[in-house]
A protein has these predicted regions:
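Helix-termination/interfacial motifs at the ends of transmembrane alpha-helices
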Residues: 248-267
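Conserved small/polar residues in nucleotide/adenosyl-binding loops
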Residues: 285-294
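General alpha-helical segment detector with a strong preference for membrane-spanning helices
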Residues: 83, 251, 294-295
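Hydrophobic alpha-helical transmembrane segments
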Residues: 269-274
Length: 296
């Protein structure tokens, strides 16, 4: 944190949540610092406009290696930006901006534009990776490999939904910046925020297409399952149709009434066998004649 106000130029202050909690005041930010959200409170992307500042949070759908999400809080005044980051989200972007010498004096808006642009710089590549995983899953379904489908499909659907929600929220943030209610940004900077908003909208459309693609793959999987179940039911129907007359025959002669002459006929047993074989042959021939070629 700063221990004195800068003499000139815009200042970017990077804190973590503990430093924010113990920092009672920063030079030039005494009246607004309490509006700064901590990184621990960052669960969505949002921007809240107040009379003397603009504050909000950023929460990325991707996370760190330990599985925790990349989040930060931020506060914007006319000449100052405060970022609250507990992990590895904001600091790498700040270093990149400094390295590329993009930190222009008296240009909070330009810094915010560069920062937000870095947030989405590789997102199209990440969405393409998700699409590749979805395509591989679709190819497995088409190849009849339906085992272990539900878990990766569920992960893909949750992931695409997270990215879509993220871009929808980020679009709202870009809209707040572009509207410039506090008058912090120049017309040129508002134009940059408009460009950023358009890129976010395109990424949101890409994520929506991925969501629809995952839904199509899920439908394809369900269709394959239904086809397999239909084949099983067809086999059971054929077996039942063939053996139902035999069941009737067995039940009929199983009553063993004394008045049944076939029971005492020496050819009765072979005759029943021949009748059963004939019934099976006739039933099978009839079913084959009425089956479509793909069911034979």
């Amino acid at each position: 944190p700063l221990d004195r106000a800068p003499e000139s130029g815009a200042a970017v202050v990077l804190l973590n949540s503990d430093e924010l909690a113990h920092e009672t005041a920063l030079p030039g930010l005494d009246a607004v610092l309490h509006h700064t959200p901590s990184a621990r409170d960052a669960h969505v992307c949002k921007a809240e406009v107040r009379s003397n500042c603009l504050s909000g949070t950023l929460a990325l759908p991707r996370g760190r290696r330990d599985g925790t999400r990349l989040c930060c809080g931020y506060l914007v005044t006319k000449d100052r930006v405060v970022l609250v980051d507990d992990g590895e989200m904001a600091e790498p972007y700040l270093k990149h901006i400094v390295k590329e010498k993009r930190l222009i004096e008296n240009s909070v808006g330009r810094f915010l534009y560069d920062f937000f642009e870095l947030l989405i710089a590789r997102d199209l590549h990440r969405l393409e990776e998700i699409e590749d995983r979805a395509t591989a899953l679709e190819e497995r379904v088409l190849a009849g490999e339906l085992e272990e489908f539900s878990t990766p499909m569920s992960e893909l659907r949750k992931e695409t939904m997270a990215w879509y929600r993220y871009y929808s929220q980020l679009d709202d943030v870009a809209c707040e910046l572009r509207e410039n209610e506090n008058g912090y940004f120049s017309d040129e900077e508002c134009g940059l925020f408009r460009l950023f908003e358009e890129r976010v909208i395109r990424l949101r459309e890409e994520s929506q297409l991925l969501r629809e693609y995952c839904t199509q793959i899920q439908s394809l999987f369900q269709s394959e399952i239904d086809i397999r179940q239909n084949r099983i039911m067809q086999i059971l129907t054929i077996v039942t149709t063939i053996f139902l007359p035999l069941t009737l025959l067995v039940g009929w002669y199983g009553m063993n009434f004394s008045g049944m002459p076939e029971l005492h006929w020496k050819y009765g047993y072979p005759a029943i066998i021949l009748v059963s074989v004939a019934v099976v042959a006739v039933s099978y021939t009839h079913l084959r004649a009425h089956e479509t070629p793909e069911h034979l």
